């Protein structure tokens, strides 16, 4: 029997990229999933009886509570929360950053995951079990990978991850983070390249080029690689891994 058989997961950002890869892999291993995304759910997921979906904006005040209540109504419990949804920021430096970009990045990349954790923790405490996995980035541990808003949002999420891990470690609840390298998903394509801070990008180009070289040599990180790590962290095989920040980037994080 699969280690994920019948476990119940909430997966945000499940309509594309890493979220889609994770939901697809989890379903193939017998998990029950509530997917959440601002976009429509792919037919490849909705055809599964064990997949339920909410199309919602995670920054709306009522959404986190709605997500958790729906999961309990559909499946009766919550074994794992995977906070995968996120946006980029145009690589804006602090002196080119707009208020709108700062607020959107923080709202989606930091505030929404924290509010979802706030909603699931009481249920996990009652169950005396649960695993939360937050998705970071190279920018979660470095200042030379993205713009100031994205970098701040991912650093903040790593701090929240560690705090939650420590606070609830005696209650059977774990909280970890996975930091992907440059995975080819729609997150970059969703932004307008004409608005990017090209001067800021130029200062990071040697870092980005080092990672791009891996892809050219067939060593690039794929969404499925991230999914494998995420699902390991919600499985019983990782029961003593708690508060970890795990890069999945073929050593990009050592730069």
Swiss-Prot record:
SUPFAM superfamilies for this protein: NAD(P)-binding Rossmann-fold domains
Coiled coil start-end: none
One Gene Ontology term from the biological process aspect of the record: terpenoid biosynthetic process
Positions of the catalytic residues: 150, 154
Keywords tagged on the record: NADP, Oxidoreductase
Name of protein: Short chain dehydrogenase adrF
Gene Ontology molecular function, alphabetical: oxidoreductase activity
InterPro entries in alphabetical order: NAD(P)-bd_dom_sf, SDR_fam, SDR_superfamily_enzyme
This protein's record includes keyword Transit peptide: no
Pfam families: adh_short
Gene transcribed to yield this protein: adrF
Source organism per UniProt: Penicillium rubens (strain ATCC 28089 / DSM 1075 / NRRL 1951 / Wisconsin 54-1255)
């Amino acid at each position: 029997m699969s280690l994920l058989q019948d476990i119940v997961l909430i997966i945000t950002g499940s309509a594309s990229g890493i979220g889609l890869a994770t939901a697809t892999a989890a379903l193939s291993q017998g998990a029950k999933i509530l997917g959440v995304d601002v976009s429509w759910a792919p037919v490849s997921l909705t055809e599964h009886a064990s997949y339920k979906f909410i199309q919602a904006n995670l920054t709306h005040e009522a959404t986190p509570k709605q997500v958790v209540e729906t999961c309990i109504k559909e499946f009766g419990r919550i074994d794992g929360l995977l906070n995968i949804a996120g946006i980029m920021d145009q690589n804006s430096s602090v002196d080119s950053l707009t208020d709108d970009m700062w607020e959107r990045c923080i709202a989606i990349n930091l505030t929404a995951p924290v509010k979802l954790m706030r909603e699931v923790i009481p249920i996990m405490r009652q169950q005396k079990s649960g695993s939360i996995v937050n998705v970071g980035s190279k920018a979660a541990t470095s200042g030379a990978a993205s713009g100031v808003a994205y970098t701040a949002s991912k650093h903040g999420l790593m701090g929240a991850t560690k705090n939650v891990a420590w606070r609830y470690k005696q209650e059977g609840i774990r909280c970890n983070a996975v930091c992907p390298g440059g995975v080819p998903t729609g997150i970059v394509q969703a932004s307008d390249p004409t608005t990017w801070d090209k001067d800021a990008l130029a200062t990071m180009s040697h870092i980005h080029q080092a990672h791009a070289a891996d892809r050219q040599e067939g060593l690039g990180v794929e969404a499925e690689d991230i999914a494998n790590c995420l699902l390991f962290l919600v499985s019983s095989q990782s029961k003593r891994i708690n508060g970890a920040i795990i890069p999945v980037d073929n050593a990009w994080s050592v730069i």
